[in-house]
Each structure stands twice: as structure tokens, then as C-alpha cells.
Regions:
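Flexible, glycine-/charge-rich segments associated with ATP-binding catalytic modules
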Residues: 50, 142, 160-244
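Active-site helix-to-loop segments that bind/position phosphate- or nucleotide-bearing substrates
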Residues: 1-154, 159-173, 192, 201
Length: 244
């Protein structure tokens, strides 16, 4: 909370001079009566899922049909948004395969099949921009690994922006404006910002995939859910189109 307050105070003279309770109210963390808002609980609460169980992540590796098991490493992640981001990226790191590569000295090293930056950005995007309305109250962010695809699905579709605009400098729109503003001032345990606050997460994922020589991310919006797909391997998986 101290780090959040310090970051917020740097943005405005009025906020710099306000009491802590005022800062939290003006930033939408607390209501006027001092209770946590939904955005505040989700972003900064100790256990948001105790209030709304859907404010979590379900992740699993989907196995090939015909086997005894349908999934591997099925987890239900809980905690405030920054912790969800850390847990989900760690889960991805242990389940996405690595390729053999070499460092500048010629030493053999393991290189992840997908750029970690792209993985982190699509997860952060799903967490920050998921719909929080009652219609999606029973829906979690879902992460799946299916063959050579990393799939992240969040409740709710795009608002104020089209699929074609994703990644464009002017193609940004916060589904949850209050949550977005809160997250601009939050960091994970390793000191990284949850979001940069410039709407560049999708663009960063696109650049990371291109730099790795991989297919562009694929995005799908069907109104009730938004899906981002990252694929490793040179050829697009069957039934997929490359993103723009």
C-alpha cells in the first residue's frame, strides 16, 4: 500500500497533499464510506476471491485425446491482481517447452519456445481488461496450453476499440477505467510494473513475437470473451490465422 500511495502522489500536487484515505477514495480503491470497491479489492485486496471467486485464474495443459488424463498441471490461482500475474507467468514458464540455443560465448542454453515478454503482456492484458460486470461474475480468466499454442481467454469482449486497432498507438481503451488507473501504480514482487499505462501491452507482445521469428499473436473477440493466442513453431496451427 505504501508503494502504491507513493507512486500516486508523484502524479499530482493535489494527491501529494491529500491524506491517505483521500488518496484511496480518489483513486477508486475505497468508496466514500471507506469500503473497498470491486476494482480496489481485485487489485489490492489480500484475498479477492473470498469476495468474488471468479477473480482468479484457471490454468491447465490440455493433453491429447485418447489418453487416461485430459489435463496436466491444472491450477486455480488466487490473490490480488499483481500476484495472479506473477503466478500465471511462473506457471507458463514451467509448462512451455524450451529450445536449445547458445549465448554470446557459445555456451548451450535453454531458450523458451515463446518470448517471456509476450506471455506476460497477454496475461496482464487479460487480468486488467476482463469484464467485471455481473454478467461475467461466474467467469474466470482461463489459460490453456494446447499443443503448440498458449491461449488466454478473459471474460467480456473489446470495448471502444476494434480487433484491427489492437497494437496501434491510438488503439487503446480501458474496459475498467478505475482498475486501469490503479494498476498503473502497482508492481509485482520483482519490481516490474503491472502495466505501463500507455496501452502498449498488445504492441509489446506483437514486437516480441516478431523478434523471435514467430507468428503474430492471434486475437479473437466474440463479445462475451476475448482470446489471445501465442503459437510457437514456424507454421500456423491448423484453423488459425495470423494476427495483424
Amino acid at each position: 500500500l505504501d508503494a502504491f500511495e507513493t507512486s500516486v502522489r508523484r502524479t499530482s500536487r493535489r494527491l501529494a497533499e491529500a491524506e491517505r484515505a483521500e488518496v484511496l477514495r480518489w483513486m477508486g480503491v475505497l468508496t466514500k464510506s471507506g469500503e473497498a470497491t470491486l476494482a480496489g479489492m481485485y487489485a489490492m485486496g489480500r484475498f479477492p476471491q473470498g469476495w468474488r471467486p471468479s477473480l482468479g485464474i484457471t490454468a491447465a495443459v490440455r493433453l491429447s485425446a485418447g489418453g487416461e488424463r485430459r489435463t496436466h498441471d491444472l491450477v486455480h490461482l488466487t490473490g490480488p491482481l499483481p500476484e495472479l500475474l506473477e503466478q500465471a507467468t511462473a506457471w507458463a514458464a514451467r509448462n512451455i517447452p524450451a529450445d536449445m540455443g547458445y549465448d554470446a560465448a557459445g555456451n548451450g542454453i535453454d531458450l523458451p519456445a515463446l518470448p517471456p515478454r509476450a506471455i506476460r503482456e497477454v496475461i496482464a492484458n487479460a487480468l486488467v481488461h476482463r469484464n467485471l460486470d455481473a454478467v461475467t461474475e461466474s467467469k474466470r480468466v482461463e489459460i490453456r496450453i494446447v499443443r503448440n499454442r498458449f491461449i488466454v481467454t478473459s471474460p467480456g469482449g473489446l470495448v471502444g476499440v476494434s480487433l484491427r486497432q489492437l497494437g496501434d498507438p491510438d488503439g487503446k481503451s480501458a474496459v475498467n477505467a478505475t482498475l486501469y488507473e490503479i494498476c498503473k501504480h502497482l508492481r509485482t514482487e520483482d519490481g516490474q510494473r503491472v502495466i505501463e499505462g500507455e496501452g502498449g501491452g498488445i504492441r509489446e507482445a506483437q514486437h516480441a513475437m516478431a523478434a523471435a521469428g514467430l507468428p503474430a499473436p492471434v486475437f479473437r473477440d466474440v463479445g462475451l470473451r476475448f482470446t489471445a493466442i501465442l503459437q510457437w513453431g514456424r507454421e500456423p496451427a491448423e484453423g488459425l490465422e495470423r494476427g495483424r
